[in-house]
Design a protein with these regions (language model features):
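TPR alpha-solenoid repeat register
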Residues: 44, 78, 109, 143, ...
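Canonical positions in the second alpha-helix
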Residues: 33-34, 67-68, 98-102, 132-133, ...
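Canonical tetratricopeptide repeat
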Residues: 47, 81, 112-115, 146, ...
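Catalytic core of non-heme Fe(II) oxygenases with the double-stranded beta-helix
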Residues: 458-459, 463-473, 477-573, 578, ...
Length: 607
């Protein structure tokens, strides 16, 4: 890019000062004048595009950025800005090449691309982008989060902890390194250590939105909800547009109040201040849908979605809400999003919507396109098998052989307990301490009328819970031997080894149940029964685990195909792509379970 003449340089400095002060209106006016007088000033075009985008004119911003790129195809900031805009619009096929070019010179571009790769379950690519920039211990929280997320997705959480612990211990005054260690500890399911590290950073006066957010996450995992809420509010005072923090705060408020208005109150204040922030609107829609109010979720996006130039990502979010009650509208929104950008999120929505309007053949075509690029996505496999079932395709019977692939086993009492009953009694006491006796169901989860724990139980220090997960090893290995090897999505990944990938406990009260769902990022999933109501009878299905009824609308509707009657001490293992849910029951006693997912253990490759 050519050097600015002195008068233009002064004008650009004035614009930068306005942008830093947050005066977008005046900055936009001055940039428009600069571009009119200097139509070949690439950086002015880029900044003007930024102000256009901030004002909601995505199409105008893209036009300006493409003009700037035509003037100087190698100006890295333009490549990065246009790539990020396209990515935000769901046009990843166009965005990724630009961001890869920009990432060679601009760390921000590498960060944006790494976040996208992690979101798309491509952790190895994300790791290659961020690891080189995290070695010095000065990377900010966004970098560290993506680095740790990539390692965690690869099953290398402990490696992330060891890496950042070395950096923190080598430079005790480097608070960024200590914060990075806290992020790694949180991702590894070690919340007590993460809390200590985050508290140390805060005590030293390093009070950023990011450290408050890390602190809050560790407190949530430890069940310290009042302190976690305070930390999230501190975070949002510093960064009121942080959608992740709003989502976490909403979870906390909802699980203790069950009131939608209270749950979104802080987010509503942010939306009053930033009414054009699509990420905040999408967060609100997700929260409302997670609270079971899909129609309100759709309503809060309907005005934006009706606009001709609505961003594809917003159309998809609105479509996900509509999918619960109006698949035809969801289909229309998905098709609009796909016309703007061929994103996997829009295509996945379209596949589900087509099942809801009776077009199983069309849904199958979309699934096969998506599975070519993401063969292990359990939700896509569930959509594919649902389409096969509707079409009478024999492949459904092979992939969904419930009699063969759903395996109940009775757990053996671990030492030193003399029998299973005494172990389950101790386990019940340990788990009940983790459940809020007055809590509401978590947002974004399948359960209704019950509570779910917030920490990863695998990392819980309680010796009874530790004994439980050691006792799971034999039945898991029995299951892997039972299913054997093959070319289907379950068996082709079976190398005889596994690692846990999340675990939790659920306590259902009377009328409690799980909506039908799958575990999108699992491989093998589970249900272990700790305590059951006395009045559950073998003569009916109340409180049973049911398989095969989709969690989305289909035409025609599909009933459950397989039912397991639970017993205390029973562990049921099954493919994560199986639709499954719990039949409601009526009892004064609670139904207490533990669940976990496992993935194939590929960590030996990195030993």
């Amino acid at each position: 890019m050519s050097t600015f003449p002195p008068t233009l340089l002064d004008a650009m400095r004035d614009v930068n000062a306005l942008l830093q002060a947050g005066d977008l209106r005046l900055a936009h006016e001055q940039l428009a004048t600069i571009v009119e007088e200097n139509p070949e000033c690439v950086e002015a075009l880029r900044l003007l595009a930024g102000t256009r985008q901030a004002r909601g004119d995505i199409e105008g911003a893209e036009t300006l950025l493409r003009k700037a790129l035509a003037l100087d195809p190698n100006w890295t900031p333009t490549l990065a800005t246009l790539g990020e805009l396209l990515l935000g619009s769901g046009r990843s096929d166009e965005a990724e090449p630009m961001l890869r070019r920009a990432a060679q010179r601009l760390p921000r571009a590498a960060l944006v691309l790494a976040r996208h790769c992690n979101d798309q379950q491509r952790p190895a690519e994300a790791l290659a982008l961020v690891a080189p920039l995290c070695v010095g211990g000065q990377a900010d929280a966004e970098w560290v989060t993506q680095h740790v997320a990539a390692l965690a997705a690869l099953g290398r959480q402990d490696e992330a902890v060891a890496f950042y612990r070395r950096l923190a211990e080598a430079s005790p005054d480097n608070l960024a390194a200590t914060h990075a260690m806290a992020i790694a500890l949180d991702a590894a399911g070690r919340p007590a250590e993460a809390r200590r590290a985050a508290s140390h950073v805060l005590a030293r006066g390093h009070r950023t939105a990011a450290i408050h957010f890390t602190h809050a996450r560790s407190l949530i995992a430890l069940g310290e909800f009042d302190r976690a809420e305070a930390a999230l509010r501190d975070c949002l005072r510093l960064e009121p547009r942080l959608a992740d923090a709003h989502s976490h705060l909403a979870r906390l408020v909802w699980m203790r109040s069950g009131d939608s208005a209270q749950t979104t109150a802080t987010l509503d204040q942010a939306l009053q201040a930033f009414p054009r922030d699509d990420a905040l609107w999408a967060a609100k829609a997700a929260i409302l849908q997670g609270a079971g109010d899909a129609k309100s979720a759709y309503a809060c996006l309907a005005t934006q979605a009706a606009q001709a130039q609505a961003p594809p990502a917003l159309l998809v979010r609105a479509g996900l809400a509509a999918l619960d009650f109006d698949p035809a509208t969801a289909r229309a929104l998905a098709e609009r999003a796909l016309r703007a950008s061929p994103s996997s999120a829009a295509r996945s929505l379209l596949a589900a919507a087509l099942l809801g309007i009776g077009d199983a053949r069309g849904a199958l075509d979309e699934c096969e396109t998506l599975l070519a690029g993401a063969p292990d996505d359990q939700y896509l496999i569930a959509l594919q098998t649902t389409a096969w079932r509707l079409l009478g395709d024999e492949r459904h019977l092979a992939f969904c052989d419930y009699a063969q692939l759903v395996l109940p086993q009775q757990l053996q009492a671990p030492a030193p307990w003399p029998d299973l009953a005494s172990f389950l009694a101790d386990l019940k006491r340990s788990l009940e301490r983790l459940h809020d006796p007055h809590g509401h169901p978590l947002l974004f989860q399948s359960l209704r009328h019950g509570t779910e724990t917030t920490e990863d139980l695998i990392r819980n220090a309680d010796p009874v819970i530790q004994a439980l997960f050691l006792a799971f090893d034999t039945p898991i290995r029995n299951y892997l031997a039972h299913i054997g090897h093959g070319s289907d999505p379950l068996r082709r990944r079976n190398e005889g080894s596994y690692r846990f990938n999340g675990s939790w406990s659920v306590r259902l009260r009377t009328r409690g149940y799980h909506d039908n769902h799958v575990h999108p990022r699992g491989w093998v999933s589970s249900a272990f029964y700790v305590d059951l109501p006395d009045n559950l009878a073998a003569s009916n299905h109340d409180g049973c685990l049911a398989f095969g009824e989709p969690g989305i609308a289909t035409v025609p509707a599909l009933p459950a195909r397989h039912v397991v009657h639970p017993e205390p001490g029973m562990l049921v293992l099954f493919p994560s792509y199986f639709w499954h849910g719990t039949v409601p029951f009526a009892s004064e006693q609670a139904r207490l379970t533990v669940a976990f997912d496992v993935l194939p253990d590929t960590r030996r490759e990195h030993a």
